[in-house]
Amino acid sequence: MATATTTLHSTTGTVYVADGTTDGKVGYYNHTDDSTNVIRKPIPIEVEDARTLSKSPTTKAEGYQLVNFHTKIPEEHFLNSKLPENKELIEEVYFDECRRLVQEVTGAAEAYPYVYRVRNQEQNAKESNKSNFHTDFVPIVHVDRDDVTAPQRLRASLGAEKADMLLSKYKSYGSINVWRPVKNMVQKWPLMLVDHKSIEDWDYSTHMFTLHSSNDERVATRGAKEHETILTHDKRYRYIYASDMTPEEAWLFFAFHSDPALGIPHGAFWDDSTKEEALTRCSIEVRIWVFFD
């Protein structure tokens, strides 16, 4: 596991989860006017520092792992990731770096990077309460896909024929995130992972809330997505983060896994110890389809 000097064992903060709807109907979000009937509930939490846990979590056992990771790509390419030449470099060189890292750590038989996101977070806690699910950072705890939407995205990413071949060939599969800070150590809105190992029957259908979208322009680039999948509260959850995370480290976690026990809800959280002068958090995540014998 990656290491760093820290005096923290845990911190406190706030995350947001789904708490039903205002009208008792199916949850919806309209991208045209930002309207929704979903109740977003703030939850005060204690967040354990992964650096001081007695046993380091692993992707194979817990579904998430903190690792050392160095890229040969200079940071300015990530900070200006929308430029065509930088996008090409990320998708060719950085994708391959992430693929090799993921296969080495997880033991995946095959791995296919398929998308990246660069996020910048400047808001404070009060401003975040006004934001929606599709801002440039995500304070709402979620998984990227579930057992309904993962096959949809897999086929959109790799093509239906190849996707179906891989699904029939391997015993299990998932979408793993390689999440890493860019430029600075994380001082604001660290990434938080939800450990639900203590809940034996945890499943996407029992502990996640489905949010149906309409008028989503991203369908053209990422394929259809029937719904977003947002966490509902359970007092048995453990919350994990890594203090003072640097660009030389990365979280690997399953944002979806065909075995729900390894699927990790996640999201940015407001750390109560955040200093007023804390720098903007910039991060990059790469999502990778992985397949296991």
From Swiss-Prot:
What Gene Ontology terms describe what this protein does at the molecular function level?
oxidoreductase activity
Query: Which pathway or pathways does this protein act in?
Result: Secondary metabolite biosynthesis
- Stated EC number for the protein is 1.-.-.-
What keywords are assigned to this protein?
Answer: Oxidoreductase
Oxidoreductase among keywords: yes
Identify the enzyme class. oxidoreductase
Q: Which InterPro entries does its entry note?
A: AsaB-like
* Signal sequence range: none
NCBIfam families reported in the protein's UniProt record: CmcJ_NvfI_EfuI
- What biological function has been recorded for the protein in this entry? Oxidoreductase; part of the gene cluster that mediates the biosynthesis of squalestatin S1 (SQS1, also known as zaragozic acid A), a heavily oxidized fungal polyketide that offers potent cholesterol lowering activity by targeting squalene synthase (SS). SQS1 is composed of a 2,8-dioxobicyclic[3.2.1]octane-3,4,5-tricarboxyclic acid core that is connected to two lipophilic polyketide arms.
| Similarity annotation | Belongs to the asaB hydroxylase/desaturase family.
Return the protein name. Answer: Oxidoreductase R2
List the source organism: Phoma sp. (strain ATCC 20986 / MF5453)
Tell me the organism's taxonomic lineage: Eukaryota, Fungi, Dikarya, Ascomycota, Pezizomycotina
